[in-house]
Regions:
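Extracytoplasmic beta-strand/coil segments of soluble accessory domains associated
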Residues: 142-183, 203
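Flexible loop and strand-edge segments within Gram-negative outer membrane beta-barrel domains
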Residues: 275-296, 304-363, 369-388
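Short acidic/polar hinge/loop motifs at secondary-structure boundaries
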Residues: 60-61, 166, 182-209, 297, ...
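N-terminal periplasmic accessory domains that precede
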Residues: 91-95, 141-144, 161-166, 193-198, ...
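Gram-negative outer-membrane beta-barrel transporters
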Residues: 441-445, 538-539, 543-547, 567-648, ...
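Membrane-embedded beta-barrel scaffold of Gram-negative outer-membrane proteins
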Residues: 263, 364-376, 473, 481, ...
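C-terminal beta-signal and adjacent terminal beta-strands/loops
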Residues: 640-647, 671-765
Length: 765
């Protein structure tokens, strides 16, 4: 009996030893090389090890069972992988780590027109991928930009909900918007074209805040937004994304990739948006949100050529029908004075492409063209506009020793015509230009960039825009950059300022408007902090300064019934500091935090005034956490804005002269437990904020939008408040106690209340 027990004990020990003898080993790599000192842990146990100089690791004496292995290394994303040990055979398992610089090492092209890693570029470029925009799904690029620090979509009309993009407090026309590096969205389409760009076409968005005129021309005064569309070669075979909201907005994105022979790959994208619900929660008998139906079709082709030379061409067509106004409005009232409505039909076509010439030297021919037709009625005011823009550019890219040269010639043709009295005949403008840029490597840690552009405007003559940039890399984790340049901008009021179109105020242009000129500079600092447990913190801070001469300002205050445009008799300044902080934890928690402090002012005759609709402070955030065991991702996003100065119509106007502090916050949950599918749902505007709060009304005189009952003073009229009303101004009467006219310009944010949304994505790769 004792012998039997002894044999059983020896057998058990032998079996236990066999179990403990199993090992897991392999190599840890990243960015094409083996990683030394990476931490490898067997979760749920005390076993851990560190890779050697060859990136090799080995975990010994692992028993049979199911485990999770976690691998962490400074500068790389933490990876966790399931592994099962079914028998006593040793297991070989390699790991490939991804860079964890939170897109600091993304390849960008917007800063210098060359593909370069963000950290190696002398020009600061911010990059936002589709992952960022999926945190708060929207139907257009315009809405998607609301969670980017220092970038604010600004609504310009409380009825038709048109808007533009402000960068660091500068109005939309100071921002150049590109698609694949081509100037597609500009002038007339800054007002209506932005809402027609579907998110489904976007690979990433690059943003340059500050001077970029030496490469992109005079319009890039305040910065640029470059929308990089998807590469057909890397796109999924088929994708679909549909979401709807409790407001009954519906958005559908479809994408399909197909090959034509062995030489061509094509990506076809379709976007359809529809919102046809008349909602009036603020009870002013006007629509809270513009009704809209929009379809956009996009087709991009990549062609394979010898020596990997580039040839890509893309086209997009868009049609939109939008209206807002009196809740009783129908199409039969369009342009009439019975029921007020603002109705805009937009048709737009675009063509862009790049072709690398078949020479040993790197010569790239880029081209773009667009046509934009707009047929609008703002009550009885008719605005019918037609714009055509063509652009052609040839660049030469050459490295000579320490010099990385880029030279180019470009020509831009603009045609514009409308039916307003301010446009007596169609305007045609040629803008040929030549530019050269030299990026000089002074040492492994420092480089300098010198650039100069010369354009000749067929109306305003010669335009010089120099540029200077310096980059110093103290070490792998600390980088300083300084940029400076000038800008020059020709203003077209009726294509840039929606308030000039509506007819709710008379437009007065006091003198021949001179082109605006600017000088600007910014200082950029990047600090990366890596922790041994895999946590990463990235800090990027930028101080910026822009001074304008000949700045054109819109005066809403001198006469409440007019918008008076004139060059400022002085100067204007936009300055501030902006900080972004990215934090990645190995647990799956990720934070993106940003804040910007602004000081914008117009200085005229020694008097400094803050412009309308310009905040002093803004902050954004995105907090994401993924629960791996549930395949569930949570995204909490939001922004906050400080008060802005708002235009009032009279001294008796009861609306607040400033907006309050306000915040728009959203939450989303995404489930990805099914192959190729994602389900997402959430709530937008959690705090239920609308501009109507704390105001008696937003749009003035909605009961009399054609001003039929407004009394204009002859200079002797006495209002109900006992004061003589100056000639030409509105008399305060019992029917109009505040002395107002119909006006839609008192707007600074979206008028949608809290709402839910639900969506489904399908991706076939």
């Amino acid at each position: 009996m004792k012998n039997s027990i002894l044999i059983l004990i020896l057998f058990s020990l032998q079996f236990s030893f066999a179990q403990e003898s199993v090992s897991i080993s392999g190599f840890v790599s990243g960015e094409g090389k083996k990683i030394q000192a990476a931490n490898v842990r067997l979760l749920g146990t005390n076993q851990k090890t560190v890779t050697d100089s060859l990136g090799f690791y080995s975990l010994e004496n692992v028993t049979i069972g199911d485990y999770k292995i976690q691998v962490t290394s400074i500068g790389f994303k933490t990876i966790t992988q399931k592994i099962s040990i079914l028998n006593k055979q040793n297991i070989s398992q390699d790991f490939e780590l991804e860079d964890n610089q939170n897109q600091l090492n993304e390849v960008v092209v917007s800063g210098t027109l060359k593909a370069v890693k963000r950290l190696e570029s002398a020009v600061p470029v911010e990059v936002y991928s589709t992952v960022f925009f999926k945190k708060n799904p929207t139907a257009s690029i315009y809405e998607a930009l609301q969670n980017i620090n220092g970038v604010r979509p600004q609504l310009n009309c409380g009825v038709c909900n048109t808007g533009d993009i402000h960068i660091n407090g500068l109005e939309g026309p100071y921002t150049l918007i590109l698609i694949d590096g081509m100037p597609i969205v500009s002038s007339l389409s800054t007002v209506y074209g932005l809402s027609g760009i579907p998110n489904s076409l976007v690979e990433r968005i690059e943003i340059v805040k500050g001077p970029a005129s030496s490469l992109y021309g005079s319009e890039a005064v305040g910065g640029l937004i470059n929308i990089i569309t998807k590469n057909p070669t890397n796109a999924p075979v088929f994708s679909a994304d549909y979401f709807t909201t409790s407001y009954f907005e519906s958005n559908l994105d479809l994408g399909m990739k197909f090959n034509v022979g062995k030489k061509a790959t094509s990506l076809l994208g379709v976007n359809y948006f529809n919102y046809d619900q008349v909602i009036d929660k603020d009870k002013d008998n006007f629509t809270d949100v513009t009704l809209s139906e929009r379809i956009s079709v996009f087709n991009k082709w990549n062609f394979r050529r010898n020596n990997n030379r580039l040839f890509t061409i893309a086209a997009r067509g868009m049609y939109e029908d939008r209206w807002g106004g009196d809740v009783r409005w129908e199409k039969k009232y369009r342009g009439g004075d019975e029921i007020y409505g603002e109705s805009i039909y937009t048709k737009r076509g675009e063509l862009i492409g790049s072709y690398q010439l078949p020479f040993e030297e790197k010569l790239m021919l880029s081209f773009s063209g667009n046509v934009h037709y707009q047929d609008s009625r703002y009550g009885t005011t008719s605005y019918i506009a037609n714009q055509k823009i063509g652009f052609l550019q040839l660049t030469w890219d050459k490295k000579i020793g320490r010099n990385d040269l880029l030279a180019g010639i470009a020509n831009r043709y603009s045609y514009y015509d409308d039916n307003t009295t301010a446009t007596k005949e169609a305007e045609s403008t040629w803008l040929p230009g030549i530019f050269v840029q030299d990026e000089i490597t002074l040492s492994p840690k420092s480089q300098i960039l010198l650039g100069m552009r010369y354009d000749y405007n067929s109306i305003h003559g010669s335009i010089f825009t120099p540029r200077f940039a310096y980059r110093w890399k103290k070490n792998e984790n600390t980088i300083f950059r300084f940029n400076a340049g000038t800008g020059f901008r020709v203003v077209n009021l009726f294509t840039e300022d929606h308030a000039a179109l509506t007819g709710s105020r008379d437009v007065v242009i006091k003198s021949d408007l001179k082109p605006e000129q600017s000088i600007n500079a910014n200082l950029n600092y990047i600090q990366k902090i890596n922790f041994t447990n895999g946590t990463f913190i990235g800090i990027e801070t930028t101080a910026f300064y822009t001074r304008f001469s000949n700045k054109i300002i819109s005066d809403y205050e001198t006469d409440p019934n007019k918008i008076i445009y004139d060059n400022i008799n002085g100067y204007a300044i936009s300055q501030g500091i902006s900080t972004n902080v990215d934090v990645n934890f190995p647990t799956g928690l990720k934070l993106i935090l940003g804040a910007t402090v602004l000081d914008n002012k117009n200085v005229e005759n020694g008097i400094s005034e803050r412009p309308f609709l310009t905040e002093n402070f803004t902050a954004t955030w995105s907090i994401s956490y993924k629960i791996e065991s549930l395949n569930l991702l949570m995204d909490y996003t939001g922004n906050v804005y400080s008060p802005m100065k708002l235009p009032l119509l009279s001294e008796y106007d009861p609306r607040s002269p400033k907006s309050p502090w306000y915040s728009i916050q959203n939450i989303q949950f995404t489930y990805s437990g099914w192959k190729d599918f994602e389900i997402y749902a959430g709530i937008k505007n959690l705090l239920n904020f609308t501009p109507k709060q704390n105001n008696p009304f937003l749009i003035s005189r909605t009961n009399d939008p054609f001003d039929k009952n407004v009394q204009i003073s002859d200079g002797t009229s006495v209002g109900i408040h006992g004061k003589v009303v100056p000639q030409g101004q509105v008399v305060d009467t019992p029917d109009n106690p505040y002395g107002l006219t119909f006006d839609t310009t008192y707007v600074y944010g979206q008028n949608q209340t809290i709402r839910g949304f639900f969506g489904l994505r399908y991706t076939l790769r």
